[in-house]
Amino acid sequence: MLTVALPKGALLKESIRLFQAIGLDFSGFLDPANRQLQIVAPTGNAQALLVRTQDVPVYVEYGQAQLGIVGYDVLREKNPQVAHLLDLQFGRCRLSVAVKQASPYRCSLDLPPHSRVASKFVHCARAYFEQMDLPVEVVPLYGSVELGPLTGMSEAIVDLVSTGRTLKENGLVELEVLFESTARLIAHPLSYRLNRFGLHQPIEQIQALLSSPVP
């Protein structure tokens, strides 16, 4: 049976809507009373796993799921061995460097050498500043990253920005964008090559949906 890894959180609703559009209904995950982490589609030919966003590529890489939906930001940070198939064009956001609005910094290169930068995207942040030849200390933080500059623990943060509202409400401002991120369809490489569980069919259906003109 085809297994799909779906991400908890912001991408879940659109991910379920996408699979519904090709005849695979996993909407039970949206029921507030639901406690199941594994749901079989009514058609009986596919099941979905509900997992943390960061775990989606792990399930796909190890073959417990043949397909998955995950943000490009996670793929950049984790660099998993998966097949990158389609840009699904939802869940749009960006990974940015931000500092306190009152700070004197106007671009990333204004940061003093050996500044502290708080982020849960440790590898992306480190690679970005290494590319700029600016030595910084990347401090791993996995919640309320905005508190880094506010408490003086870090001069800057590297974090996902969608509307920018959270930054603004916390007195922070974007300096630069590392990259844009959207939801991506990924697959287990060997399963994709061998077309296990008829994997190519849902992929082609999703591709056709993305190519069709918006009414």
From Swiss-Prot:
The gene is hisG. Lacks the C-terminal regulatory region which is replaced by HisZ. Pfam families: HisG. Keywords: Amino-acid biosynthesis, ATP-binding, Cytoplasm, Glycosyltransferase, Histidine biosynthesis, Nucleotide-binding, Transferase. It catalyses: 1-(5-phospho-beta-D-ribosyl)-ATP + diphosphate = 5-phospho-alpha-D-ribose 1-diphosphate + ATP. Catalyzes the condensation of ATP and 5-phosphoribose 1-diphosphate to form N'-(5'-phosphoribosyl)-ATP (PR-ATP). Has a crucial role in the pathway because the rate of histidine biosynthesis seems to be controlled primarily by regulation of HisG enzymatic activity. It is an enzyme of class 2 (transferase). Belongs to the ATP phosphoribosyltransferase family. Short subfamily. It comes from the Bacteria. Its EC number is 2.4.2.17. InterPro entries: ATP_PRibTrfase_cat, ATP_PRibTrfase_CS, ATP_PRibTrfase_HisG, ATP_PRibTrfase_HisG_short. Pathway: Amino-acid biosynthesis; L-histidine biosynthesis; L-histidine from 5-phospho-alpha-D-ribose 1-diphosphate: step 1/9. Heteromultimer composed of HisG and HisZ subunits. PANTHER family: ATP PHOSPHORIBOSYLTRANSFERASE, ATP PHOSPHORIBOSYLTRANSFERASE ATP-PRTASE. GO terms for biological process: L-histidine biosynthetic process. It comes from Cyanothece sp. (strain PCC 7425 / ATCC 29141). This is ATP phosphoribosyltransferase. NCBIfam families: hisG. It is found in: Cytoplasm. GO terms for cellular component: cytoplasm.
